Every structure is written in structure tokens, then in C-alpha cells.
Amino acid sequence: MENYQKVEKIGEGTYGVVYKARHKLSGRIVAMKKIRLEDESEGVPSTAIREISLLKEVNDENNRSNCVRLLDILHAESKLYLVFEFLDMDLKKYMDRISETGATSLDPRLVQKFTYQLVNGVNFCHSRRIIHRDLKPQNLLIDKEGNLKLADFGLARSFGVPLRNYTHEIVTLWYRAPEVLLGSRHYSTGVDIWSVGCIFAEMIRRSPLFPGDSEIDEIFKIFQVLGTPNEEVWPGVTLLQDYKSTFPRWKRMDLHKVVPNGEEDAIELLSAMLVYDPAHRISAKRALQQNYLRDFH
């Protein structure tokens, strides 16, 4: 800690307080995340230290990963600080700022670039068996060159995803996969792909795709667009803990109507991401090969 000087508190992240800080020797500005531990007296779980050290190795090996770089891990007085490169703009703020200029949509080429970088970052981490579990526009940071990077990758597995954040707001459900909402105990990389699909649609539409205000409202908002799932479209769905046979039966809508300004290739990719059955949801690796993203290779 003695190498860093805190400049100001810049936010309350999913896992704790985030500070802007300066490295005393180099003068480099960084973001320091103070990880809040559920049981302060227990200290930092060794599994968490191992996970985060692995994350740092992953980060170091390739700076083209579209993941925010983890620069340092500080462990002092039963507190854990993670030091990341400092990026002060996230995708939510970016989209809000565009709205303030009176623009009704993001430039389609920019949506394409951001979606490529998002899928590329997710693929990089999935290929190393790391799942994010909490992707949302606030977790996607934009650097000075206008490139999108993923923050907080790998932290969910180490620390869990809390139901509330530090200001006690409920963590957003808008990007949460249906298998998680319906109580599945086993989930995999598909949860991130669902979130990517929701973010992708939001960039095109300029409004959230499934803005639920409770878990059941979120589930119903998904059903109203994609139709109420059954065993035919999603084998095993009726066995999930929170599935109810009394759910209203909605018919699937045409995604072209839900995302009216999406071009054909974009809707095709979106459809492959928003598949109910996680086993048939497109992988990040395959998504990179789709027509919509092919220009960026």
C-alpha cells in the first residue's frame, strides 16, 4: 500500500469501494479496488488469492485480450486491494452521453466494433475457463482510444456475486441468463453469452432489452419477447427449481420488431446469443466467426 497514494473515491463496485490512486514512484494513475470480505476476521481466502493471481497471469500474457489489465495485488491487514489500469468511462456512461447530444442511436460501425471487442474479451476468458457471471454496461470500460475492455472478469468465481451492491441497490437483473433466474445450480459460459446478447441489443436499440424490476418481472419480460419456454425448445426447463407450470404462455416475437434498426447480420447473431437452451447458445469463439463480426479479424 505504501507505493500508492489514494486520490479520490470513484465508486462503489460490485465487490467494494473503488479508488483512483497514483503510484508514488512512476506517477501512473490506477484504479484500486478494495475487496470487501464477507468475514473480515477470517482474512482473505487463499482460494481467492490463487484465482486472482491466475487472473493476473492471464492478463499479463496478452494485452490484446480486451480485458482491463490487473497490474498488482496488494494484501495487507486482512484487506485485499486489486490494482487495475485506470479507465474513467464505462459503456453505460458512454451511451448516456451520446443521448445527451440528441443522437437517437450509436453509430452502427461503433456498435459492431464494441460488440467484436466484447465477444473477443469473453472468448479470451472462456478459453481459460474463466466465467464473468455479471456482465453489464457498467462493467465494460472504454479507453482513450475508444476501445472497449471488460472489467471484473474472474472476480465472481473468487468472491461470488452479491445480491446487493455496497449502496444496497439490488444488482441489476437485466443481463441475467434465464437459467440463473430459474434457479439452475449448474451453469457455464452461456451465462456470459446471454449477457452479451442483452448488451448488444441495448447498443442497437438504445434502451435495455429486458428491464425487469424483480426476478419474476425479469423472467416475464424475457418470456414476452422470446416466448414462454417449454421442453421442446429447452429440454429440462420444467425441472428447474423456480420454473412454474402456471407461468403465462407468451408467443415468441419477431426480433426484427424488438430491435427494429438492427441489420440482418446483427439480428442473426443476436438470435444465436439469446437461445434459451444454454447447450445451444452460440459460443464466443463461434460468434467471432459470424458474418456480423467477420470484418474485424
Curated annotation (Swiss-Prot):
Its EC number is 2.7.11.22. Cyclin-dependent kinase that acts as a master regulator of the mitotic and meiotic cell cycles. Required to drive the G1-S and G2-M transitions, and initiation of premeiotic DNA replication and meiosis II. More than 200 substrates have been identified. Substrate specificity is in part regulated by the bound cyclin protein. When complexed with cyclin cig2, it drives the G1-S phase transition. When complexed with cyclin cdc13, it drives the G2-M transition and initiation of meiosis II. This is Cyclin-dependent kinase 1. The modification Phosphotyrosine is found at residue 15. Residues 4-293 form the Protein kinase domain. It is found in: Cytoplasm. PROSITE patterns: PROTEIN_KINASE_ATP (PS00107), PROTEIN_KINASE_DOM (PS50011), PROTEIN_KINASE_ST (PS00108). Phosphorylation at Thr-14 or Tyr-15 inactivates the enzyme, while phosphorylation at Thr-167 activates it. The keyword Nucleotide-binding applies. Forms a stable but non-covalent complex with regulatory subunit suc1 and with a cyclin. Interacts with cyclin cdc13. Interacts with cyclin cig2. Interacts with cdc37. CDD domains: STKc_CDK1_CdkB_like. Its main location: cytoplasm. It comes from Schizosaccharomyces pombe (strain 972 / ATCC 24843) (Fission yeast). The active site is at 134 (proton acceptor). Changing residue 212 to S: Arrests in G2 at high temperature. GO terms for cellular component: chromatin; chromosome, telomeric repeat region; cyclin-dependent protein kinase holoenzyme complex; cytoplasm; kinetochore; meiotic spindle; meiotic spindle pole body; mitotic spindle. PANTHER family: CELL DIVISION PROTEIN KINASE, CYCLIN-DEPENDENT KINASE 2. Keywords: ATP-binding, Cell cycle, Cell division, Cytoplasm, Kinase, Mitosis, Nucleotide-binding, Phosphoprotein, Serine/threonine-protein kinase, Transferase.
